[in-house]
Amino acid sequence: CIRDSIQSESGNQPDIIWVHHEKPGSIGVDDVREQVIGDMQIKPYSSRYKIYIIDEAEKLTQQAQNALLKTIEEPPAYGIIILLTTNADTFLQTILSRCVRLDFRPLRDTLVTQYLQEKYDLTDYECRFATAFAQGKIGRAVTIATSKEFAQLKEEVMHVIRYAKEMTTAEIMAEVKNIANYKLTIDDYLDLMAMWYRDVLVFKSTKDSNALIFKDEMSLLAEQAKNCSYEGLEDILKSIDKVKLRLKANVNFDLVIELLIMAIKEAM
């Protein structure tokens, strides 16, 4: 009905539940039990259905997926669970076999930016940065734009980018230990780093700042574009890709990150 649509648009529809998680890198069993399994025992307040939306569902731990399995197998007639993900391969086969898969196309960047501008008190730069990183996923864009954890992650990445060239061996080892605190969000860490060096490469090639993502760091970006060769920038981007592959193959985390920082230091 019209009332439900208005409530849904404003975020006040009690029968549409967005599942939140405290840890930025994972959705744990307690999150699932409290916000889905337990809550689903309560019938809808005003609607025919009660809908649970788990964004970034690829972050569900194995324990959380197992806890969710019985509810997915035998939900109440009014219960609907929507798992939003960019990587269905992270789900247990028992989960996948009990779900209906629907593929969504990414939203246009203009729509994501417009949504952020209308719904949140953000600068134009913050909206455009979140949009660029989210790649058409509006929920992801909201998380990036509003999460203190993501802002801190970005600062950690920028610290390495600023100072890798001057780091001593001891400082590199200390930084590796610091980055280990971000194991659960290492993909975001590496993606941010790759975005930076792509910006440097683009600016070095074109001297055009309009297409850049890190516009708030123009002086540093221009300096690195001037001082680093094309080959050096390409080597850094290749090193980041290698890190992702090695981590998926369970190569030692500290060793892989140490080699990455050393590659950046040598290239700069």
Predicted regions and their residues:
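Clamp-loader machinery-focused feature within the broader ASCE/P-loop NTPase space
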Residues: 3-63
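Charged, glycine-rich active-site and insertion segments that engage polyanionic ligands
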Residues: 6-7, 77-78, 87-192, 196-268
